[in-house]
């Protein structure tokens, strides 16, 4: 008889309070998400103190709703998984504190999950991850290529040297007068415009897998400011298309080069910006033309943003590898990706 595992998973690293119940690492029984976007829009970005207060208000409600929707009792659970970094320290502390209290009260093991590993493991809800694999993580705080030779081994082979792609989207969106978060709006505008501004593609042809988006951001801002000074009206659609094409060209070039140089069986696209239609379509086309053997797995659109389900998927894998934490677990806002799971025990 197959053994069943049930994990309560908690995510609170930024501006989403999310709790999920995950069965066997790849079946979602519930995935409650309390978003704070409306509270942060007027500030043009996430305010850490506001985020923390919202998490405090929502965390116990989300836990109760997740269990109720999953029709799972506390005594049915096998473990509690929680994001402990990277992220906003105050926000992380709410989730970590709640997870520790729940685990202690119900005598359950506690699984510490790196938020970025969670994003990668959202792919489990599409199909099993096959190793060796490469993950392209594109989000508000990270743009990374992560090589995974085997399960629970993570090696960053390329990362942004300045702004993350998602961060650049939000800053450019602010200049365009778009609401935060601006990624979806820019993507929609881009599909209606043309790449007429030919913004720079930083590091596109350099012999490495690193990214840089600060120069693109500056070029975009300078173009808009110059137009304002001479009372020239620029097309938002063309601005969005030009900006997005620059981002996509660089990300695609680096990813394709990595796939050519590494012997991998699967490429995973994950993170908030992984929901971008332009990026998904371009990678589909480029990879389809260049590789016959490569399995390209895109995280489900509704699981690209922060959510508890992905933490549960990663948590189940870590549980099988006996990665647990005790009640001294603390939030680590600057948690690095090149980590040694054994050191957490």
Swiss-Prot record:
Single GO cellular component term: cytoplasm
Taxonomic path: Bacteria, Bacillati, Bacillota, Bacilli, Lactobacillales
Highest taxon, organism lineage: Bacteria
GO molecular function: iron ion binding; N(6)-L-threonylcarbamoyladenine synthase activity
Protein function: Required for the formation of a threonylcarbamoyl group on adenosine at position 37 (t(6)A37) in tRNAs that read codons beginning with adenine. Is involved in the transfer of the threonylcarbamoyl moiety of threonylcarbamoyl-AMP (TC-AMP) to the N6 group of A37, together with TsaE and TsaB. TsaD likely plays a direct catalytic role in this reaction.
Top enzyme category: transferase
EC number: 2.3.1.234
Assigned protein family: Belongs to the KAE1 / TsaD family.
GO annotation terms (biological process): tRNA threonylcarbamoyladenosine modification
Major localization class: cytoplasm
Source organism: Pediococcus pentosaceus (strain ATCC 25745 / CCUG 21536 / LMG 10740 / 183-1w)
Cofactor stoichiometry and binding remark: Binds 1 Fe(2+) ion per subunit.
Listed name of the protein: tRNA N6-adenosine threonylcarbamoyltransferase
Keyword annotations: Acyltransferase, Cytoplasm, Iron, Metal-binding, Transferase, tRNA processing
């Amino acid at each position: 008889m197959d053994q069943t595992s049930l994990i309560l998973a908690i995510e609170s690293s930024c501006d989403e309070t999310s709790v999920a119940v995950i069965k066997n690492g790849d079946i979602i029984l519930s995935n409650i998400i309390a978003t704070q976007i409306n509270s942060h829009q007027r500030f043009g970005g996430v305010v850490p103190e506001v985020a923390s207060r919202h998490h405090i208000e929502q965390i116990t409600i989300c836990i109760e709703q997740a269990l109720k929707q999953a029709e799972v009792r506390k005594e049915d659970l096998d473990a509690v998984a929680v994001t402990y970094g990277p992220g906003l320290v105050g926000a992380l502390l709410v989730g970590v504190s709640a997870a520790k209290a729940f685990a202690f009260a119900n005598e359950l093991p506690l699984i510490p999950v790196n938020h970025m590993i969670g994003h990668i493991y959202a792919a489990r809800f599409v199909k099993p991850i096959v190793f060796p694999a490469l993950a392209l993580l594109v989000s508000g705080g990270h743009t990374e290529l992560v090589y995974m030779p085997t399960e629970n081994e993570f090696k960053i082979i390329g990362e942004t040297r300045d702004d993350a792609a998602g961060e650049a989207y939000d800053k450019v969106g602010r200049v365009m007068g778009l609401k935060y978060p601006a990624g979806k709006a820019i993507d929609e505008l881009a599909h209606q415009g043309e790449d007429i501004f030919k913004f720079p593609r930083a590091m596109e042809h350099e012999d490495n897998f690193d990214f840089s988006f600060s120069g693109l951001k500056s070029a975009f801002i300078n173009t808009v400011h110059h137009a304002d000074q001479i009372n020239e009206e620029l097309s938002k659609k063309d601005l969005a298309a030009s900006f997005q094409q620059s981002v996509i060209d660089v990300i695609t070039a680096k990813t394709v080069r990595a796939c050519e140089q590494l012997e991998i069986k699967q490429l995973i696209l994950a993170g908030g910006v992984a929901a971008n239609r332009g990026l998904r379509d371009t990678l589909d086309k480029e990879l389809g033309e260049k590789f016959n053997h490569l399995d390209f797995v895109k995280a489900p659109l509704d699981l690209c943003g922060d959510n508890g389900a992905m933490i549960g998927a990663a948590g189940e894998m870590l549980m099988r590898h006996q990665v647990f934490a005790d009640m001294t677990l603390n939030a680590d806002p600057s948690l690095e990706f090149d980590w040694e799971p054994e050191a957490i025990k």
